[in-house]
Amino acid sequence: MKTSAITATLGAVHATNALLTIRNNDCAFFTHNLTLAENTKILNTTYHAPHTVNITSGQQNIYNSHGFCEVDATVSYGRNSTLHFSVYLPDALPYNGRFMAVGNGGMAGVLDKTALMQQLNSGFASAAGDAGHLASLNNDGSGAPDTYIPYLHNPEEVQAWIHDAIALFVPSSKDLIEAYYNKTAAYSYYSGCSTGGAQGFALAQHHPELFDGIIAGCPGNWYSHLALSFLWNARHAAENTLAYLPQTALNFTGQAVLEACDAQDGVKDGVIENPLECNFSIDSLACNATQISRNNNTIICLTPDQIAAAKAIYDGPRDSETGEQ
């Protein structure tokens, strides 16, 4: 019995190793005779066995539930710009026959490998790009006053960032999927949040033919106005000034507005259906002559400087000549 068990175990190990060899070879060679768009260049292909790739996301470690073929590539665009992207192709058995492209966050410049892995683990062939520029060359993807961000001075890279970055890598990603599985994906989807949400809106407007469905969460949309609002808010509630609004003050203000206007639509559900109909007065949160703004480290009212800052933020910037918002 022991001999039979050992023989069976060795046979299983041999079969597993043989299967890994086949999948390694499939991943390594399937792009060799593949014709992609002339501006697309394959950098490398790597096969990963199940549970061998670890992506750290906050306090969580995410492993690949399935074996997959990773294809890393670039797309050249504009006069001298490059977009990097990766495609994760799960083994045939867990593959659900569908394609999911994922977007970027913030200033982008990196691939969202957490989202890539999550979609892979859900059975999708997934792809992501860096939006056409590198965070490492752009203040590590962080914006700050008086900081030079090279890609923001390159009109082609700014255009790619929101409008075109996803569309640049999706056609080649679909070609890779078709070549690997010998058939096209049955459906193609996009998912993104914040900057990725704005990219989703741009896809629907400028590249609607690429996807069967688009998930655009919390879209950081209308960037000309959004960027101005960041500067405006920082100007009126700057840190280390009397007008500064810490998160506790923002939470206090937001909760007061919610309590005043939540039920206007007939349902008290934690959502203000129409903020423009909410006629809440920030002055109602002002500290009176006997109050201090904090009580046992809890915000209970706003100081005159904070009231002025909150009013400016709610009112927003206006055209200095016309007075229009």
Question: In which residue ranges do the predicted regions lie?
Answer:
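Cap/lid segment of the alpha/beta-hydrolase catalytic domain
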Residues: 96, 106-182, 228
